[in-house]
């Protein structure tokens, strides 16, 4: 049976097919008669519950012009589900239906091609076949009848293009036009009804082979609007060779016969938390292949505010210049989501290299995002340089001078908000210093200048201080009273105990002499003249700027582009040998959580997995690199013996321990690949028992305290949990409620090991916990007890791993003319005759006290492979040096036998101290090499 005959058979309702071969004119006349029959076509097309046989006024549909026709041959891109209206308003009688000789268009699809184009039946049939061939459509073999039953609401019968081939009925109009012409009230809104909505066309009501309503056969997600629905279905790229093509979800909507599409990210709902309907898009779908070519979305002004801002956040390729931020009120929640997106570097809003320019754009929405972005950084107890390193390690701080000036202004405000008691600081002064530090970093490390052309320390201090004074005058507009009040408040903050214990203040005036510091503390007790205030202000900033210059000279302020290899695509082995492919991806270094597979034998692997952040390098003193709160010890009593390194007090990592930041809450997706402390955010924390050991002696009465230990890269912090009125949950600890840290130290050049050994380990009877010791570079020993032997070993591995990753190769000392007792045995005395050599043995020898080389407390920037190679090479040199030193012992005793006892004793002590130092370095190096090889092998084999 032919398709035309089948359609005629269905229309007439005959029991047998008809072989009627009449002309098109007779068929048209027959269609006119059938539309006036007792059961019109619309009643057969739509559910019977939509119509009632009651008189009503003439429907507005009769005013539709006949010229309102739709374009033929457009491939329908989706199914549109129509919400029915109230029966009292949606009911239509038979007399209300218009009768026209033109063909009827339903849901935007042309019902007849012959009436609009003047073609014959045969040409029309060929046209339909061509359309189905071009768009991959298949003919419908059967039509599902939809008869209402009491138990199930009736559904509209399925339709296809072949169904309307021979049914010319009236003028062209769409089903969307039908419903839009009806009066709509709140009670008619299907979304606000408590009762089920009118029957909808579902997937079950359409034949499986009816391909003209579907882009793919996969499950779709529906988003309901006011008068229609939008369905999102995953569409795969037709270009299989393009590996970078994204798997997008294309939303199709048919409105007034025009098929339009949206490009949205499949992971993010275009509505967010809102049910606001999505209105028309200005991107027309001309061809199915245009899905892959869509790169931006134009959001019209009529779109609701929530939808516009949510789309601006969820669409990765959105053209932000086309979104008018002035036409709607900024949504605070949307701006905060955008700020977190930029902070995480996911590039949904803007690429990382253009983030700063986008943030400082003069639009309300961008300003709101910048405000929330800056608030994500916690600069409390950090100095200006350290805070600048923190933000530069996460954001590409580059661009035009005007853009940098605007951004640094927001940075200065945030720094002053988080450090309200900063010494001699206000937003204008912080802004001037931050800008000068960026210029200094460019001059010393980035600009191609000779050594003589680079800025000297005196030039930097003078120029920056001149800028600080100008900023101070601009802040108070020459008002001397306000300026003096500002000075006095800074002095009072400095003199108070709370401010003296601040790491930021200690780090800024570490170079102040004790006399000046004592003088400043007494200034608030007597009346101060303006001259004295300005002198103190000048002395303070001169010293602070010198520290900052030296810190930047030793370690430059790094940008995120130094960590491009940390977001390595391990599934693409071509990128390992193609640096340009990695360099083109401007991503942040904290995307290590996306790692799924680890290649073997590549140095890029070690860099991407465990390279420590060097964005927070600062210059620290080597002595006593441990800070202990002098106001109280672990038992809450006053601790008279202060152990402090001012620069170590100011040290923090590039990820502050703020509980509201997303980086702190981290769930590793692949726990079998690496240890928890091995990946971002590189934090290990837990509750331990703690006992301090000083001068190699413990107290006679062992007193243990419960502490919260936090290890973040090379910074180890202890918080006392034995304070009164402190209730905590071991499973959910909030650091902000614990209080100030009692100990904060760097673990560079430190060593963690069980105490005293595996066979002599002492186990607490109550908790069955194992002891372990931590020896720092300042010779301070900290003893801990873990909850279990397994937990104790985990802490030992974590401490030794980050000590190995952060420590640089130590120095052994060079050739010197200082005699420590074995200078006569090392050949340092020139070629001499035997008589002269025998004579010198009887000379009086001046032996100096031997001291080891200071520990380099600047973290290492080498990758895991480079660090391991450096340690292996140094191990060979250290063994050779140790063997030579051991061989000097007997010869040294013979040479010093004729010397006084004091000289002999000091020489022997010096030899022993150096021997112990070499032995300690050998043990530490063996542990470092072992732990690095362990985790490198674990990463390669996983």
UniProtKB/Swiss-Prot annotation:
GO terms for molecular function: guanyl-nucleotide exchange factor activity; phosphatidylinositol-3,4,5-trisphosphate binding. Residues 295-497 form the SEC7 domain. GO terms for cellular component: cell cortex; cell cortex of cell tip; cell division site. Residues 24-40 have a biased composition (Low complexity). CDD domains: Sec7. Disulfide bonds: none annotated. One of its GO terms (biological process) is intracellular protein transport. This is PH and SEC7 domain-containing protein C11E3.11c. It comes from Schizosaccharomyces pombe (strain 972 / ATCC 24843).
